[in-house]
């Protein structure tokens, strides 16, 4: 790339700043960490790697970066693209080969969405590999819009009020997942990916499934944002500002024990002035 334009420079600085803020706010990366950056070949993971490589140079702490891609043996997967890109960058990398494609095609009926099973199989394989190489953090490329979409997916279709946290410890306690792009918008990431001309690898397994529930939610949020700019950011801020006493989850707040506080100062009305 040549010299960046003013707007391109602003975009790059904004993504780096927001990623840095998210990393700091959630203590995502600590001194001595070995960060396994999960690369899918999509715009989000390329942007995440690009931003993390910059932050590695300027951060006051030292941490390692290891890029990992999972070759799921999808037909037509361009095996050469990521190794060539990572070699040019001079980044340590691993390609994990696991034929989850055949498993998904065998278990999921034709016409049904494959995302859930594919994601579980991929996540399990990557968790195991992170453990094998001694990675202390596992970085995923989910962004702010992904987090908000997941919140609505769980609310609309699962009846639960949960999203996708910026930092998560796996159930077995062996892996810590971080999402450095948690504060970044998909719009900015797409613009940055276009600007950098990353060698995008399309997902042939699920990319054509246009009737996904996530796409329905995404379309809804896009329409909201079009009519009311800033709404997505406001929803994300709400996820950071939860008041359990104002919801209805008895496991989060002890509603059953609520009683009048007899020691509280009484309030009296001046009846004559009503």
UniProtKB/Swiss-Prot annotation:
SUPFAM superfamilies to which the protein is assigned, alphabetical: Adenine nucleotide alpha hydrolases-like
Cofactor detail note: Binds 1 [4Fe-4S] cluster per subunit. The cluster is chelated by three Cys residues, the fourth Fe has a free coordination site that may bind a sulfur atom transferred from the persulfide of IscS.
Catalysed reaction equations from the record: cytidine(32) in tRNA + S-sulfanyl-L-cysteinyl-[cysteine desulfurase] + AH2 + ATP = 2-thiocytidine(32) in tRNA + L-cysteinyl-[cysteine desulfurase] + A + AMP + diphosphate + H(+)
Uppermost EC category: transferase
Entry's EC annotation: 2.8.1.-
Keywords: 4Fe-4S, ATP-binding, Cytoplasm, Iron, Iron-sulfur, Magnesium, Metal-binding, Nucleotide-binding, RNA-binding, Transferase, tRNA processing, tRNA-binding
Domain of life, per lineage: Bacteria
Main localization of the protein described in the UniProt heading: cytoplasm
Names of the cofactor(s): Mg(2+); [4Fe-4S] cluster
GO terms assigned for molecular function: 4 iron, 4 sulfur cluster binding; ATP binding; magnesium ion binding; sulfurtransferase activity; tRNA binding
UniProt-annotated binding residues for [4Fe-4S] cluster: 115, 118, 206
Subcellular compartments: Cytoplasm
Record text on subunit structure and interactions: Homodimer.
Function field: Catalyzes the ATP-dependent 2-thiolation of cytidine in position 32 of tRNA, to form 2-thiocytidine (s(2)C32). The sulfur atoms are provided by the cysteine/cysteine desulfurase (IscS) system.
Name of the protein this chain belongs to: tRNA-cytidine(32) 2-sulfurtransferase
Organism annotation: Pseudomonas putida (strain W619)
Gene that this sequence comes from: ttcA
């Amino acid at each position: 790339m040549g010299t960046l334009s003013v707007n391109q420079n602003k975009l790059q600085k904004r993504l780096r700043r927001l990623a840095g803020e998210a990393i700091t706010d959630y203590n995502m990366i600590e001194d001595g960490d070995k960060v396994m950056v999960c690369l899918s070949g999509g715009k989000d993971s390329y942007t995440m790697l690009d931003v993390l490589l910059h932050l590695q140079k300027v951060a006051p702490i030292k941490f390692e970066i290891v890029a990992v891609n999972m070759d799921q043996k999808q037909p037509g997967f361009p095996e050469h693209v990521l190794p060539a890109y990572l070699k040019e960058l001079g980044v340590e990398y691993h390609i994990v080969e696991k034929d989850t494609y055949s498993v998904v095609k065998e278990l999921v009926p034709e016409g049904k969405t494959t995302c859930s099973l594919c994601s579980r199989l991929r996540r399990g394989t990557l968790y195991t590999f992170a453990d094998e190489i001694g990675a202390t953090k596992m970085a995923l490329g989910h962004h702010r819009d992904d987090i908000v979409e997941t919140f609505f997916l769980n609310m609309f279709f699962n009846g639960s009020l949960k999203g996708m946290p910026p930092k998560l410890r796996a159930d077995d306690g062996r892996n810590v997942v971080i999402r450095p792009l948690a504060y970044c918008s998909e719009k900015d990431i797409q613009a940055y990916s276009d600007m950098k001309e990353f060698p995008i690898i399309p997902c042939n397994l699920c990319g054509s499934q246009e009737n996904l529930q996530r796409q329905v939610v995404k379309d809804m949020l896009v329409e909201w944002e079009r009519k009311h700019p800033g709404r997505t950011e406001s929803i994300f801020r709400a996820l950071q500002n939860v008041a359990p006493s104002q919801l209805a989850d008895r496991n989060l707040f002890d509603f059953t024990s609520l009683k009048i506080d007899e020691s509280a100062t009484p309030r009296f009305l001046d009846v004559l002035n009503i």
